[in-house]
Amino acid sequence: MNRNPRMSKFQPNPRSRSRFQDETDLRSLRSFKTDFSNYLASDTNFLNVAEIMTSYAYGESNNAHEKEIQCDLLTENGGIEIDPTRLSYRERIRWHLQQFCYKTSSHGIPMLGQAPNSLYRAAWVFLLLICAIQFINQAVAVIQKYQKMDKITDIQLKFDTAPFPAITLCNLNPYKDSVIRSHDSISKILGVFKSVMKKAGDSSSEALEEEEETEYDMNGITIQAKRKKRGAGEKGTFEPANSACECDEEDGSNECEERSTEKPSGDNDMCICAFDRQTNDAWPCHRKEQWTNTTCQTCDEHYLCSKKAKKGTKRSELKKEPCICESKGLFCIKHEHAAMVLNLWEYFGDSEDFSEISTEEREALGFGNMTDEVAIVTKAKENIIFAMSALSEEQRILMSQAKHNLIHKCSFNGKPCDIDQDFELVADPTFGNCFVFNHDREIFKSSVRAGPQYGLRVMLFVNASDYLPTSEAVGIRLTIHDKDDFPFPDTFGYSAPTGYISSFGMRMKKMSRLPAPYGDCVEDGATSNYIYKGYAYSTEGCYRTCFQELIIDRCGCSDPRFPSIGGVQPCQVFNKNHRECLEKHTHQIGEIHGSFKCRCQQPCNQTIYTTSYSEAIWPSQALNISLGQCEKEAEECNEEYKENAAMLEVFYEALNFEVLSESEAYGIVKMMADFGGHLGLWSGVSVMTCCEFVCLAFELIYMAIAHHINQQRIRRRENAANEY
């Protein structure tokens, strides 16, 4: 309703003042405008006043123009209002739009309704269009920026107690050699492995350094040159080797006669010989206890060493090389103390009969015509994993090293560990029995202070004398991971050697990623088909799950290196079709990742441990105490532990950790703020103005519906009247 404030005080137009019939009428009209109640109670001629108001035009009247329906209401305060319900439908719509133009809080629209002429109105229409176009451009840019779903990474350094991670410890030798050979499949595999290694060694010996003179003619001149051929490995001629021997101590020479093809029955008939792979000669030989690991000043190209340097040797040529010397010190051979010693009875012949292996079984093992020792060992390790998968988990656990045989001493935060309670067994296909420290997810462990003394310190005994011939190194495999994660020692582990104290300094990082639509991370929990049941989701586990599903689908068997799905049997070690199918798809795994057939995202919440490594020789000669379960003299125990034991330290370098969290760079709040800012800048529109437009739309819709219903009622009445 439009109410003209100027009508509150009724002032007739001076030019029409004289047009009143008499002063009585004028006084009556003023009295009517002054006191409506008194006027109704008076004897004023109401019809005369109404006639005067409708007969004369006044400048202040809004209803002076002619209309089809003209009904003005007189209010108590003297105003005159139009009742829109008495207007026609089109006039009512027009009236509402006009009123909206006058009342809206938008800056440009009222100027259209109040424009005095068409030119003025056209200018404002042009300005409104320019502003509307500019606003649309800015609004599109704001929406596009929001749809990018950009994110920012916040890095915080928190000085708080960090939870101690889970530590998984494994022996680099998965199974005990003395136990595993009783298994027929393993015996066959080791037999084929030794024969293949022997052939590879023979071919390498033939390809060792040799010089030959060649003559060739260049421009008519005969030139003699020496050409040096180098084999695959540049190793010395002599190396220590275990052999069965017959020793005659009566002659006082302490030398023994080797029986290289026989397996010794014990330490009484075992000796160490200087073995030459080129000539297969083993000489000299002495009892095992007469050889001592030490350091030599010089070693030649054949690995023959001397404790004392020869006269005239320059200081720059002096080197402290690890070597093994017989008791008199007259004969020394270069030898890494932690390296395995060759067994001649295995090198020259097999202690078991492997004639039962068929040609198909040999082909299934995949050695083929391999001559590279490293590749042969890798293939042999894979074959052992396949063969062991045919056994039950309980059988595999019994064939690997027990908890107390591996873990001798342990302390955490400077206090002794409970080895039985603090370490949990986890069977791994590659490393056999592994033991997890801090496995209980309900117990919170943390370091009191930073440094090695307040972390995990553990002494481990690997028993190198019971290693498989496929175990290339002696030591421990260590993995640092979160309690909820599977350790994956074959992928994320670190190797620590025996005879050293290995220190692993840690720093923790916590990652918090945004899920969809800002990212594609996997939220808490594992996926439904995740093969590592009971563990949190990880990218490595996802890829292994995808690969296992692919192998089962295409080969009909599962890869024994990973957990199976749905009880599918693992691929058999001597099944040629299984092995060829598995090898084929293993080489295609890179293409699978590249073509996104295996789509594995990062977890939304992840704990990462970065590690720094250092080592020192252990135990020291001053450590003259009986270590672990050694009952010998202190010096002998030290030597034994140098070859068979390792000391590990895992600790926090500082009691703080980083928190990396992702957050939305441009959220809905910022988008609405920018949107409203541009809307106010270019159109002068606020949220309240938008509400005004919404109310106008509802009013127009309501009037349209009411008009439609009213028209239907009129038609029904007309039809009913026509029927009568």
From Swiss-Prot:
Entry's Gene Ontology cellular component terms: cell body membrane; plasma membrane
InterPro entries with a match to the protein in the record: Deg-1, ENaC, ENaC_CS, Mec-4/10_cyt
Lipid bilayer topology: Multi-pass membrane protein
Composition skew (Polar residues), residue ranges: 1-15
Skewed-composition ranges (Acidic residues): 246-255
Subunit (UniProt): Component of a non-voltage-gated amiloride-sensitive cation channel complex (also called the degenerin channel complex) composed of at least the mec-2, mec-4, mec-6 and mec-10 subunits; the complex mediates mechanotransduction in touch cells. Interacts with mec-4 and mec-6.
Family: Belongs to the amiloride-sensitive sodium channel (TC 1.A.6) family.
Protein name stated in the entry: Degenerin mec-10
Natural source organism: Caenorhabditis elegans
Lineage: Eukaryota, Metazoa, Ecdysozoa, Nematoda, Chromadorea
Gene field: mec-10
